[in-house]
């Protein structure tokens, strides 16, 4: 499972990196975190978390610094979080999280992306009840039992710890993600491949042929929108 999450990050970075969209999206997220709190990541845990994730996605330092500098300025640009749920082909479900300065624009764009690419946008709650929000931490290692014990000793609410292909994947309660990361750092883990809040599907579907092609086109269209931060789904091996 650790390889799965690392591969998802690598795939997304490679795909988005060609157009620098991943940089722009992290730039907005960093700006918002810095604007809402202290622009110093050492005293703003939310900002530090976003910066760590940006580094995992290979966002250059100058992009990170530019977003923080913008937050230090007099700009009053406001961003609002949003969520749009919908359906793709053959039982596939999609959750889209956005961060936008223009909610009407974003809602229209997401609805269009669904409608023109083989999907249907549903009502709020129509899909999310089939997903569980969890913290996901991935790093190199193979001793899941020891990691599990270390996290329990640190009073971290852990759902599961898996070891596969030289990587350990930790699933935490969403409220304990930061505590879990710190506990692992306290036990000598310095480098993380993934530290994310994820919506994990309770069950997955497998798509093939035209259905898979349609689904990929739909996800690509959603992720291409500058206001879309995350796309979650229930399709296996995608």
Curated annotation (Swiss-Prot):
Cellular component, GO, one term: cytosol
A Pfam family recorded for this sequence: Transcrip_reg
Record keywords: Cytoplasm, DNA-binding, Transcription, Transcription regulation
InterPro entries: Integrase-like_N (IPR017856), TACO1_YebC-like_2nd/3rd_dom (IPR048300), TACO1_YebC_N (IPR049083), Transcrip_reg_TACO1-like (IPR002876), Transcrip_reg_TACO1-like_dom3 (IPR026564), Transcrip_reg_TACO1_YeeN (IPR026562), YebC-like (IPR029072)
Transmembrane keyword on record: no
Subcellular localization(s) per the UniProt record: Cytoplasm
A single BP term in Gene Ontology: regulation of DNA-templated transcription
Homology family: Belongs to the TACO1 family. YeeN subfamily.
Family matches, as HAMAP family: Transcrip_reg_TACO1 (MF_00693), Transcrip_reg_TACO1_YeeN (MF_00918)
Protein name (Swiss-Prot/TrEMBL): Probable transcriptional regulatory protein SUB0364
Classification of source organism: Bacteria, Bacillati, Bacillota, Bacilli, Lactobacillales
């Amino acid at each position: 499972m650790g390889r799965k999450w690392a591969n998802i990050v690598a795939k997304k970075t490679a795909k988005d990196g060609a157009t620098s969209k991943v940089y722009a999206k992290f730039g907005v997220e960093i700006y918002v975190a810095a604007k809402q709190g202290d622009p110093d990541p050492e005293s703003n845990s939310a900002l530090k978390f976003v910066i760590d994730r940006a580094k995992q996605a290979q966002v250059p330092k100058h992009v990170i610094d530019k977003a923080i500098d913008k937050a230090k300025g007099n700009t009053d640009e406001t961003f609002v979080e949003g969520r749009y749920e919908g359906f793709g082909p053959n039982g596939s479900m999609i959750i889209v999280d956005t961060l936008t300065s223009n909610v009407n624009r974003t809602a229209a764009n997401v609805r269009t992306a669904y409608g023109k690419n083989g999907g249907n946008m549903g009502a709020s709650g129509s899909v999310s009840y089939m997903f569980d929000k969890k913290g996901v931490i991935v790093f190199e290692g193979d001793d899941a039992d020891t990691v599990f014990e270390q996290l329990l000793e640190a009073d971290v609410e852990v759902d599961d710890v898996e070891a596969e292909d030289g990587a350990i994947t930790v699933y935490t309660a969403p409220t304990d993600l930061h505590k879990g990361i710190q506990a692992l750092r306290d036990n000598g883990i310095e480098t993380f491949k993934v530290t994310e809040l994820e919506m994990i599907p309770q069950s997955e579907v497998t798509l093939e042929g035209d259905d898979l092609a349609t689904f990929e086109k739909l996800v690509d269209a959603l992720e291409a929108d500058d206001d879309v931060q995350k796309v979650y789904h229930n399709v296996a091996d995608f």
